[in-house]
């Protein structure tokens, strides 16, 4: 399916270079996955720094800026995310959204527990609760990519998404 629009000569060249569809798919999405890991790591580091400074209230209140940053990031890696979200069936990434959310939920649970223990957060969240909220959140964020919306429209929708997901209220900052 990935090579559908190519002529036979190009298909042969593709399959010579890659051991199969899975290897080709992996090569196409690898830069996106690496960029995601870098972004997640940087965001996590920033959040813990703000937690240590007791600045989570201002971070949570300024949610629109990082949300637009995430949306911009998705569009910088648009092709990779389209593959992961719309064309990964039959690959090890067929459950990308669920796997991404599960990892994010584990990280968020540790963060939420730390914030609660330090009395920065007044709400003790449970793991399944975080998982459900993050599933909804990331599903909404990925929707513009899945539906091929223009970047400008997706950035515009960030205002509504930010209102819907009031992290300050969810975490009790």
Place the predicted regions along the sequence by residue.
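Amphipathic alpha-helical packing segments from all-alpha helical-bundle domains
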Residues: 61, 69-76, 90-117, 128-135
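Alpha-helical structural segments
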Residues: 16, 23-47, 61, 65-69, ...
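C-terminal/domain-terminus segments
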Residues: 84-101, 156-169
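Solvent-exposed, amphipathic alpha-helical segments
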Residues: 35-46, 80, 136-144
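C-terminal peripheral helix-coil segments that are non-catalytic and often amphipathic
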Residues: 76, 106-114, 130-173
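Single conserved hydrophobic/aromatic residue that forms the stacking wall/gate
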Residues: 1-10
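Short linear capping/connector segments at secondary-structure termini
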Residues: 50-56, 84-91, 120-122
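Short hydrophobic/aromatic patch on the recognition helix
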Residues: 10-18
């Amino acid at each position: 399916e990935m090579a559908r629009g190519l002529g036979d000569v190009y298909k042969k060249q593709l399959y010579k270079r890659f051991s199969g569809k899975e290897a080709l798919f992996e090569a196409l999405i690898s830069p996106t996955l690496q960029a995601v890991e870098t972004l997640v790591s940087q965001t996590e580091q920033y959040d813990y720094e703000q937690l240590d400074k007791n600045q989570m209230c201002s971070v949570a209140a300024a949610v629109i800026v990082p949300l637009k940053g995430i949306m911009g990031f998705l569009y910088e890696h648009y092709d990779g995310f389209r593959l992961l979200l719309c064309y990964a069936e039959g690959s090890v990434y067929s459950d990308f959204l669920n796997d991404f959310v599960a990892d994010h939920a584990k990280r968020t649970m540790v963060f939420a527990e730390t914030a609660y223990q330090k009395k920065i957060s007044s709400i003790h969240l449970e793991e399944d609760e975080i998982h459900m909220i993050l599933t909804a959140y990331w599903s909404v964020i990925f929707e513009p990519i899945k539906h091929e919306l223009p970047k400008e429209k997706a950035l515009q929708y960030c205002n509504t998404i930010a209102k819907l997901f009031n992290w300050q209220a969810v975490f009790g900052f």
